Amino acid sequence: MAASAASGPSAQLAVRVIPCLDVAAGRVVKGVNFLDLQDAGDPVELARLYYEQGADELTFLDVTATVEDRSTMYDVVSATAEQVFIPLTVGGGVRSADDVARLLASGADKIGVNSAAIARPDLVGEIADRFGAQVCVLSLDITRGDTESGFVVTTHGGRTRTTIDAVAWAREAVERGAGELLVNSIDADGTRDGFDLELVAAMRAASRVPVIASGGAGELDHFAPAIEAGADAVLAASVFHSRRFTIGDVKGALADAGQVVRR
């Protein structure tokens, strides 16, 4: 089954479907625009469920601010890695190459960096040089704004707006060594109104590395357009946690739209 001709540069590869688990104090939480967080379950149990459903990868985002709960995240990653045998990406609160080393030792395969990399861009190169570009995922929380590209970077889980052009920052980070872009639309996050396709296309045009589309998935027919806009993978949270769809449902919809998926 051929992939859509409008897909990104990795179109000959299978599209990845990635559940995202936001973790606070050892529990998965969900909300809209990072607000009004509600408990959604045990992270290890959910990770195992999604693995059994056929997820291609898993992403954990540590949304906890305290040092005490940070240690809990290492335990979550370690326990998950013992039961789930697909790539694990972990982000949130990563501020140094030593943080990366500890997460990798706990069982993570890739590490997402966001606010800390904006504050100190050299962090991207430090991670890539020490562990390889494939480990360094630049996570971007993006909103519409008055910049050349029309997209602005936010920090601290979308709560702080910057004046940084999102496309320019993504391009710079890739030059510094980022091996993948996790592109999350703050405007669409949790709304279930669909991915921001203009944002996905802008990131695809600016980058040679894989692009993961995030934010806005709500219907099965939302996923294929994100791939057609240039994404290599699609990430979602609330539609999986609420049992609205399974991973298999999403892969079926992608296959029906002509995309290659792993079964």
From Swiss-Prot:
Q: Which GO terms describe its molecular function?
A: imidazoleglycerol-phosphate synthase activity; lyase activity
Q: What is its EC number?
A: 4.3.2.10
Q: Which reaction does it catalyse?
A: 5-[(5-phospho-1-deoxy-D-ribulos-1-ylimino)methylamino]-1-(5-phospho-beta-D-ribosyl)imidazole-4-carboxamide + L-glutamine = D-erythro-1-(imidazol-4-yl)glycerol 3-phosphate + 5-amino-1-(5-phospho-beta-D-ribosyl)imidazole-4-carboxamide + L-glutamate + H(+)
Q: So, what pathway does this thing act in?
A: Amino-acid biosynthesis; L-histidine biosynthesis; L-histidine from 5-phospho-alpha-D-ribose 1-diphosphate: step 5/9
Q: Report whether Cytoplasm shows up as a keyword of the record.
A: yes
UniProt GO BP = L-histidine biosynthetic process
What keywords is this UniProt entry annotated with?
Amino-acid biosynthesis, Cytoplasm, Histidine biosynthesis, Lyase
InterPro entries according to UniProt: Aldolase_TIM (IPR013785), His_biosynth (IPR006062), HisF (IPR004651), IGPS_HisA/HisF (IPR050064), RibuloseP-bd_barrel (IPR011060)
Instruction: Write down the superkingdom of origin.
Output: Bacteria
Q: What does this protein do?
A: IGPS catalyzes the conversion of PRFAR and glutamine to IGP, AICAR and glutamate. The HisF subunit catalyzes the cyclization activity that produces IGP and AICAR from PRFAR using the ammonia provided by the HisH subunit.
Name the family the entry cites: Belongs to the HisA/HisF family.
> PANTHER family from the entry?
IMIDAZOLE GLYCEROL PHOSPHATE SYNTHASE HISHF (PTHR21235:SF2), IMIDAZOLE GLYCEROL PHOSPHATE SYNTHASE SUBUNIT HISF/H IGP SYNTHASE SUBUNIT HISF/H (PTHR21235)
Name this protein carries in UniProt: Imidazole glycerol phosphate synthase subunit HisF
